[in-house]
UniProtKB/Swiss-Prot annotation:
Belongs to the GrpE family. One of its GO terms (cellular component) is cytosol. It holds the Pfam family GrpE. Residues 7-23 have a biased composition (Low complexity). GO terms for molecular function: adenyl-nucleotide exchange factor activity; protein homodimerization activity; protein-folding chaperone binding; unfolded protein binding. PANTHER family: GRPE PROTEIN (PTHR21237), GRPE PROTEIN HOMOLOG, MITOCHONDRIAL (PTHR21237:SF23). It comes from Pseudomonas savastanoi pv. phaseolicola (strain 1448A / Race 6). This is Protein GrpE. GO terms for biological process: protein folding.
Amino acid sequence: MADEQNLDAQAQDQAAEAGAGEELTTRVQVLEEQLAAAQDQSLRVAADLQNVRRRAEQDVEKAHKFALEKFAGDLLPIIDSLERGLDLSNPDDESIRPMREGIELTLKMFQDTLKRYQLEAIDPYGQPFSADQHQAMAMQESADVEPNTVLKVFQKGYQLNGRLLRPAMVVVSKAPSPATPSINEQA
């Protein structure tokens, strides 16, 4: 009988240990799932933080790159006026030669300064028309060049660090229209 009681006690102990083992296994699985979820969340937060940092760096870089945009835009009419003054003055007139040389020097200094800050002129004369960089002011028939070629530049365009600041205002060629027969040819 004592043996039976010992066997019953051992069976109860084994059953209790098995129940405790299952409980521990379940608890370990739950903790492992929680750990995996926490690690996943930690990775997501780190990736979000890296994206925010990268976006902030890009915003600062763009701000530095294009901080001069408004200022440069305000200088463009001055450059246009200097160029127009040179175009309208006679280079052979001795009475205005010193003034003309002064304007040429001032214009060159302006252009060199703008180039140093990556402000580049767009002078598309003779090039194919590009709606991205040119603004067509008129169309003109021409048999001398291909259709959609820039025939004349009214005003140069400018770009700052590759971004269009002002489009070039141009006259664009178009194919000549077929000649209409005259009254004499019809008869």
